[in-house]
Regions:
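Bacterial Sec-dependent N-terminal signal peptides
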Residues: 1-19
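N-terminal hydrophobic or amphipathic helices/low-complexity stretches enriched
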Residues: 15-74, 130, 187, 262-264
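Soluble metallo-hydrolase cores and metallopeptidase-like ectodomains found primarily
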Residues: 18-19, 99-102, 106-132, 198-289, ...
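Second-shell loop/turn segments in exported
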Residues: 18-25, 42-51, 81, 106-109, ...
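Structural recognition of the beta-strand scaffold that forms the well-ordered cores
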Residues: 36-39, 121, 139-143, 172-177, ...
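Noncatalytic luminal/extracellular "stalk/propeptide" segments of secretory-pathway proteins
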Residues: 44-139, 146-148
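Extracellular/luminal Protease-associated
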Residues: 101-203, 207, 254
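Metal-dependent peptidase/peptidase-like ectodomains
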Residues: 210-211, 219, 312, 321-373
Length: 373
């Protein structure tokens, strides 16, 4: 943290040594207090959408205001509201293919559906496989992944492209038969059974049905490949959608150079974490998120405090993102709905998962692409 703050301040007061900068501008106890508060049990792991994350957002906004940072959010506030929705996991998935009944399912993309009709088996489901038969409006069954997939993870990773391919052919849904690696299966089942949070879908477009069915020895895949025809009954039920909003926290300081102050350097971090989960060996179920990412958040607060005292030629934009642990949601929404023109951003210092052993290095990516230095 100290190294990053020193680097940031070095842009404006390069004449001072690093040691002088640290001793004159950084108060260790202040940084510690930010981290201890944000990572406290009282904030319950700062889950996106929780009341505790709202408390964290207010804490950040109040400190930016205290330092003299100007609000850059909505209606003169420090808040940049991010519209979100959580789609619950289904209460039930049942699937019957001819006389085969599935027992293990991962619903990676699902909607409530009751399908009775024809299914088609397409081996691994390559584009050539889809082009061989009429699949429109039918349920498509494939082996998971592609011929190059060697484990469950690689098979799941290949599924996204296959899902988009299936959608382009107008199929009713995609079922992939997958050999179960129990540890990996439990890991993904836990993730998908919690429901999925994403940016609010303003068009209310229906989700495409994409489900993995456990097939331990791939015997079902063999049966499907040998079947002359396949009748399918797929039922997915109990899915509910909850809409809510969460907050990015944004503020800015104006630069000192008349020619450069219209350009911005961003100092950012995400301030959310994963909330409450499975207890550890000490029966502690709160995932406090000190390293991920109370430390990074404290870095931005400290940079804001000091840059308010020692402003740079370019303007400074401070962004604390929500929803990172849910899939970079706050930063994605900000990129699509910026408070300042993106073409005026010349560099971004983002701090995430700091506090590891080596405190002597700060790595800068893309320095050759900017005029910030």
């Amino acid at each position: 943290i100290i190294s990053l703050i020193t680097l940031c301040l070095g842009l404006s007061i390069q004449a001072q040594s690093n040691a002088e900068l640290v001793s004159s501008t950084v108060v260790k106890s202040d940084i510690e207090s930010h981290i201890y508060f944000l990572a406290s049990d009282e904030l319950k792991g700062r889950q996106t959408g929780s009341d505790e994350l709202k408390i964290a957002a207010a804490y950040l906004a109040n400190h930016l205001r205290k330092y003299g940072v100007k609000p850059a959010g909505e209606n003169g506030s420090f808040y940049h509201n991010v519209p979100l929705e959580t789609v619950s996991a289904p209460s039930n998935i049942s699937l019957k293919l001819n006389d085969i009944t599935g027992a293990q399912f991962l619903g990676v993309s699902v909607k409530n559906i009751d399908y009775d009709g024809e299914a088609v088996f397409l081996d691994f489901g390559s584009k050539e496989d889809f082009e061989k038969v009429d699949v429109k409006g039918k349920l498509v069954i494939t082996k998971a992944g592609n011929p190059e997939s060697t484990n469950m993870m690689s098979k799941l990773m290949a599924g996204r492209a296959k899902r988009e391919l299936a959608k382009s052919f107008g199929v009713a849904g995609l079922i992939e038969l997958i050999e179960v690696e129990q540890n990996m299966w439990e890991r993904f089942a836990h993730y998908f059974n919690e429901g999925q949070t994403g940016l609010k879908n303003p068009e209310k477009t229906e989700k495409f049905v994409h489900i993995y069915m456990g097939d331990p020895a791939m015997t079902n895949a063999v049966s499907m490949a040998n079947a002359k025809s396949i009748t399918a009954n797929l039922k997915v039920e109990g899915i509910e959608t909850k809409e809510f909003s969460s907050r990015n926290v944004v503020g800015y300081l104006e630069g000192t150079d008349p020619k450069l102050k219209d350009e911005f350097i961003i100092y950012s971090a995400h301030y959310d974490h994963v909330g409450i989960g499975k207890p550890n060996a000490e029966n502690d179920s709160i995932y406090n998120g000190a390293r991920d990412n109370a430390i990074g958040t404290a870095t931005v607060l400290s940079a804001a405090e000091n840059l308010a005292k020692y402003p740079t030629k370019r303007s400074s934009l401070f962004i604390l993102f929500t929803g990172e642990e849910k899939g970079l949601l706050g930063s994605k929404y900000y990129a699509e709905n910026p408070v300042m023109p993106l073409n005026k951003m010349v560099y971004c210092f983002n701090s995430d998962n700091g506090g590891y052993n080596d405190t002597s290095k700060v790595t800068i990516f893309g320095l050759h692409r900017t005029t910030v230095a």
